[in-house]
Amino acid sequence: CNGLFLYTPPDKFPKLRTVQLTSAGLDRVPMDYMDAHGIKVFNARGVYSAPMAEFAVCSVLGFYKRSAFFSAAQSEHRWEKHRGLEELGGKRVVIVGAGSVGRACADRFRAFGCEIIGVDRRTAVDGFDKIYSIGDIRAAVSAGDIVIFCLPLTKETEHIANAELLCAMKD
């Protein structure tokens, strides 16, 4: 179930007792209703950790290696060199959310020689060179070269990546 309750209210299912989501976030489920009616909701935490982490690496590599530029040049039969491409080694990657997706990202970026900084509610999480508490997110983000948000969408996380926080990033 993912999005069913956007179109059909849960009271249309009078025998509903359990919901299994295909996502980690609960943003598409009326949790107040579920809690009030004793309906158990299970998410798919961890199921997409590897593909999400690989997508994050792909996106960062695409940015640093200017993949869109070279793809466009290739389609125009232009074989340009670009000597200003940066490498990931030595970059400081800030991963906001040290759950299964965040830890999978940390593992993959570490393979490129990156320093891995985490931001999480828990301040003791394996796989990170340093962990900041969620209250110190601005300090963590301002120290990073790359910032990746690995949080399920919930009431608590919905507006965490706002303009003020993103403006705190390094140039």
PLM features per residue range, with description:
Residues 122-171:
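Rossmann-like adenosine-cofactor binding region
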Residues 98-99:
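Glycine-rich Rossmann-fold phosphate-binding loop(s) that bind the pyrophosphate
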Residues 106-110, 170:
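Surface-exposed amphipathic alpha-helices with a cationic face
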Residues 1-40, 167:
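An N-terminal-biased, well-structured beta-alpha scaffold segment characteristic
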Residues 1, 13-16, 113, 128-129, ...:
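Short, well-ordered alpha-helix to beta-strand connector turns
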Residues 39, 44-92, 107:
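Phosphate-binding beta-alpha-beta segment of Rossmann-like dinucleotide-binding domains, i.e.
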